[in-house]
Amino acid sequence: MSERGSIYLHIDYKIGHYVKLLMDEIFGMENFRNDITRIKCNPKNFNRIGYGNIKDLILFYSKNKPIWNEPRKPYTDQDLKKLFPKMNSEGRRYTTVPIHAPGETKKGKSSQPFRGQLPPSGRHWRTDVKALERWDQEGLIEWSRTGNPRKIIFADQQEGKRVQDIWEYKDPQYPSYPTEKNSDLLDLIIRTSSDEGSIVLDCFCGSGTTLKSAYLSQRKWIGIDQSEHAIRVTKIKIESVE
């Protein structure tokens, strides 16, 4: 695998933890990045002892300097109200954050007076005073009634929220192949851990959904499967987008 490569293994929850031990041995525990939980279906009613299973696992490993295109998800309306509770006169949602941080610097640029104020005891400004003054001139500092300055962060200037390790990408409702994967899930993985022109390998390509996603994302691809039916389905899927 390339020094910038990554590997994602999608596995059933029943054997996932055993497979992880093998992956640790092959790729090294130090290269383990995530055990991602994928919500695969809606809740079901089963007459058995145990909790309903709606998830499976994706094990993610990479080397020291992998390709990593930070994925972001759009904020929901609920996110915006929670994370950016304030609104200015123009109707823009925002929040504020402290402009000082723990740790004291006695002689550095981040310990100088700003608008006649020094950082609180045991803290320093997050940036130099020139930057603070520029923010203030640009209207990016909010002053409280007691004179406490805070940095304004506008919601419409943020790229969205970071993707966490619980993903809700349910199985296709009408799959064309028994093990067909959710195309949005594959898009996320491919665009995060590869660049245009990178090679994407799916050694159990099944219906070819991974290869189609790679093709549409301008990646090169290699697909392997021992089933002649899988090869036929994959060929049809790839030809449908050419």
Regions found by a protein language model. Give the residues of each.
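Class I S-adenosyl-L-methionine
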Residues: 1-199, 231
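Conserved S-adenosyl-L-methionine
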Residues: 182-242
